[in-house]
Amino acid sequence: MLLLPSPADGRGTAITHALTSASTLCRVEPVGRWFEAFVKRRNRNASASFQELEDKKELSEESEDEELQLEEFAMLKTLDPKDWKNQDHYAVLGLGHVRYKATQRQIKAAHKAMVLKHHPDKRKAAGEPIKEGDNDYFTCITKAYEMLSDPVKRRAFNSVDPTFDNSVPSKSEAKDNFFEVFSPVFERNSRWSNKKNVPKLGDMNSSFEDVDIFYSFWYNFDSWREFSYLDEEEKEKAECRDERRWIEKQNRATRAQRKKEEMNRIRTLVDNAYSCDPRIKKFKEEEKAKKEAEKKAKAEAKRKEQEAKEKQRQAELEAARLAKEKEEEEVRQQALLAKKEKDLQKKAIKKERQKLRNSCKTWNHFSDNEAERVKMMEEVEKLCDRLELASLQCLNETLTSCTKEVGKAALEKQIEEINEQIRKEKEEAEAHMRQASKNTEKSAGGGGNGSKNWSEDDLQLLIKAVNLFPAGTNSRWEVIANYMNIHSSSGVKRTAKDVIGKAKSLQKLDPHQKDDINKKAFDKFKKEHGVVPQADNAAPSERFEGPYTDFTPWTTEEQKLLEQALKTYPVNTPERWEKIAEAVPGRTKKDCMKRYKELVEMVKAKKAAQEQVLNASRAKK
């Protein structure tokens, strides 16, 4: 602190007092270029002075302007101002070599240079001919600047840049040089991405993560490319609101279609690259090798575990096998013994049957009349078929140890017992069939005059007609009805409707009832046609030594086997019917011959019925 010097001796000190006003508060705001620079530095987070940054920016832009060399567009003066939309705006301004990379400052500078050179006033002063109004080519320069100076319009034009290569390399082109072919294509198309930092294609040494990021980016590519520049209609030219809406709707649909085609192009590009990428193949092979190694390791561990289990299982199986073989051997021995016994019994029955035939033959079948002899032969065959071994032995002992009269009496007694047994079986079957028929008629509820009074003969005739005229016959049910009306002895006229109703009711019968009806029909047929044997032209009549004929109806499979055997063994084949019988299991030679005769008669009857129906239809016409 500075103090005044003390006064000299003898001198006084003069003190002056003055009054001062009170302090006042003032609001002062910072202004000036330095404060402006401070604020801009703070906002831009820059340490250098704002003026230095602005100077550097201006210097860089000026250097760019100095370096920018405009290209002369040779076709400029030949452009049609009315067709300005189809011109290359960058080429018009001399920026064809820079294109979408040109800055706004460069566009402005290029336009300024073009104006100084091609303005109508300049050219007019130089003595060049000019066109009036918008017909001069200078209009193309103005339109180009309008399009490129507006960011929205420029983006629309960049989307349809005529110099952009939209081609997609094929798989064959990139077979040997994948990276050289696809790298520039992806680099070229990356300009359409909304996202920055577009991943590169990379090279053969790229990691799996980098390749996965690359393809994930391009498979989910977000493009800003739009096609409004190609709109055929301009809504500004619309005369009313409805027309403007219609134009907007048409333009939106066209843009959407072009956008879809663009995304399909990008997808095709990515698909082709993915399918040709050698790294993908390498990664798949590595993954496959890894899985194979893991699989082999698991298989090896499982194999060792299975070996231990297999040893234990083999021991158990061996013990079980030995026990099973022992059991099977016992069963086989028992079956062999049973088969031997059965064969012995068959041989014994066959021997006794032959013995019975020979005994009867020795006594000339106990008759001097040919018809009675044939009938006795049939009865003997019936005995051979139905008698058991003990009964056959007893009967043979009687025949060999007695006189002719006693033997005949014993034989007739045995025949009477068998016939009585057969008669009882038939009566039971007929009663069962009648009861079933009554139940069926009650359940059917009647079907006209023809649905009542169906006799047993009519039922048998209906079954025969249904089998005679199978499905597929023309006017089948009319033919069946006509056949029944011709051959029926009841005198009742049946219609096709009556026949259909009765056939449906018979179909509801159980298999045993159907078999009984079929047997009934066969017995009736035999009674009518089997009394006097008829000679077959295909083979001579002969005595049958086989077992008694079975009356079981022929199945479809047996019918097919019989037809095939008839084709296989023609008429001139020696022992034809023996071979045919061998081809049809379960049927004897006599069965096959009788079935053949039945089929011949059925075919003849079928042809006659069809001929009658045909004649009736012709008569109606």
UniProtKB/Swiss-Prot annotation:
PROSITE patterns: DNAJ_1 (PS00636), DNAJ_2 (PS50076), SANT (PS51293)
Assigned keywords, A-Z: Acetylation, Activator, Chaperone, Chromatin regulator, Cytoplasm, Nucleus, Phosphoprotein, Repeat, Transcription, Transcription regulation
Residue span(s) of domain SANT: 449-511, 549-604
Primary localisation category: nucleus
A Gene Ontology molecular function term of the record: ribosome binding
Posttranslational modification: Phosphorylated in M (mitotic) phase.
GO cellular component, one term: nucleus
Region of interest: Disordered: 294-315, 427-453
Domain J: 88-161
Chain positions covered by the region annotation ZRF1-UBD: 160-250
Cellular localisation: Nucleus; Cytoplasm, Cytosol
Modified residues annotated as N-acetylmethionine in this record: M1
Name of a matching Pfam family: Myb_DNA-binding
Residues with the Phosphoserine modification: S47, S49, S60, S63, S183
GO BP, sorted A to Z: 'de novo' cotranslational protein folding; DNA replication; negative regulation of DNA biosynthetic process; positive regulation of DNA-templated transcription; regulation of translational fidelity
Function: Acts both as a chaperone in the cytosol and as a chromatin regulator in the nucleus. When cytosolic, acts as a molecular chaperone: component of the ribosome-associated complex (RAC), a complex involved in folding or maintaining nascent polypeptides in a folding-competent state. In the RAC complex, stimulates the ATPase activity of the ribosome-associated pool of Hsp70-type chaperones HSPA14 that bind to the nascent polypeptide chain.
The record's note on its domains: The ZRF1-UBD region specifically recognizes and binds H2AK119ub. The ZRF1-UBD region is also involved in protein-protein interactions with other proteins, suggesting that it may be masked by some regulator, thereby preventing its association with H2AK119ub.
Complexes and interactors: Component of ribosome-associated complex (RAC), a heterodimer composed of Hsp70/DnaK-type chaperone HSPA14 and Hsp40/DnaJ-type chaperone DNAJC2. Interacts (via ZRF1-UBD region) with ID1.
Annotated protein name in UniProt: DnaJ homolog subfamily C member 2
